[in-house]
């Protein structure tokens, strides 16, 4: 279960880092947004290495589902746009898939 905590923290750091660049490059905010963006993206990379997985690719694949879910929470609470029901359905499918990837090796032993 600790893996999910690392995934969630990493996801919000990645989204925040990318959003900082979005603020600068797409919304015309100050280039100083790059600094917290780089810090956040570095923290994202460090957090993702905390996940217990035999292979990096498997950890990244499982992380993808959590990232999709975190993105919708970001959409709702930071950008203040209401996700559609189909967005939540997609998230549910992604999280189920991520769980299969993460726990699959334990089930196949």
Swiss-Prot record:
Read off the SUPFAM superfamilies from this record.
Multidrug resistance efflux transporter EmrE
Enumerate the transmembrane spans. 5-25, 27-47, 59-79, 84-104
Enumerate the InterPro entries for this protein: UPF0060 (IPR003844)
Name of the featured protein: UPF0060 membrane protein PA14_21660
**Keyword Acyltransferase recorded:** no
HAMAP family per the record?
UPF0060
Q: Name one Pfam family in it.
A: UPF0060
